[in-house]
Amino acid sequence: MQSQNTPAAGRYPAGGLAFPHRDLTGIGQLARHEILYLLDEAEQWVELNRQSQKTTDLLNGLTIINAFFENSTRTLLSFEIAGKRLGADVVNMHAATSSVKKGETLIDTAMTLNAMRADAIVIRHASSGAVRLIAEKVDCPVLNAGDGQHEHPTQALLDALTMRHAMKLPAGSDLNGLKVTICGDILHSRVARSNILSLTALGAEVRVCAPPALMPAEIEAMGVTPFHDFDAALKGANIVMMLRLQQERMSGQFIPSPREYRHLYGLTPERLARAEADAFVMHPGPMNRGIEIDSTVADHPTRSLITRQVEMGVAIRMACLEVLTRRARRTPGWEAEGASA
């Protein structure tokens, strides 16, 4: 990796105010300096979460609704912990117990959520674009916790923060020169899309690897190098990010068999040796051990960053909630914030 401490040109000043977005619906809406701003805002929460006293009252009196229309464990738990550590009242709404199961439309749901006068709504939905639609119908900030095959912005942010910590880069640093290989179901993965957007914006060299049937046709237009040969994609990589096969989004037969997929695209200790000697391994979860990643790799004591990703996820989500609720809290400078989606 070269140029490990590239300064963040055009970054907001220390304690900067003007984060111009009311909502966070995707990485695609953010400029490079805005991504860096959120990463840097998360640093204070990384430190707080490592203390015995992990809570603050910054969001005291505010209500956050986690509206999850798609099953989730780690993302929902991460957002719930983030909100509670900031002092907010957090309410979780699960699709299985919601009126959506009874035929309520998404617009009706949005109107209902808006009438509850929440101060922020976190949404996860199986349909691409659903989060943006709800954001257009409510009066409070909306955070995208994953929508269909579109985006998962906080996952990309936590992944970038994890990489920055693993490479021992200080606050304000981008990822210029970092070589990142992402392997798995690129076609159906919102995590891949959001990571590609954030990593290329931060200066990383991104390679994506997948079987031909799981590689988007237009992927090179996103500024990445596509591979179908995993061994070739690993050469020189500093970070190897594995993605699971998203069987729930597949309508046909995309791979011959799990066994054949593991043979060609599974990350084993032998295959990891083709990357840089000190390369790190990441996975957004949930993992399919023995298919896209071996347990010996996933659980490696020094090279696996998987549990650190979970740790950084809480800090990133605390940062996003704190920044997007400044308007509701009348934090100094809030007038300059929340102007656009």
UniProtKB/Swiss-Prot annotation:
Pfam family, one: OTCace
Coiled coil: none
Binding positions for carbamoyl phosphate per the UniProt entry: 74-75, 124, 152, 155, 285-286
Lineage: superkingdom: Bacteria
Pathway: Pyrimidine metabolism; UMP biosynthesis via de novo pathway; (S)-dihydroorotate from bicarbonate: step 2/3
UniProt GO cellular component terms: cytosol
Catalytic reactions of this protein: carbamoyl phosphate + L-aspartate = N-carbamoyl-L-aspartate + phosphate + H(+)
GO molecular function: amino acid binding; aspartate carbamoyltransferase activity
Name of the protein: Aspartate carbamoyltransferase catalytic subunit
Annotated source species: Novosphingobium aromaticivorans (strain ATCC 700278 / DSM 12444 / CCUG 56034 / CIP 105152 / NBRC 16084 / F199)
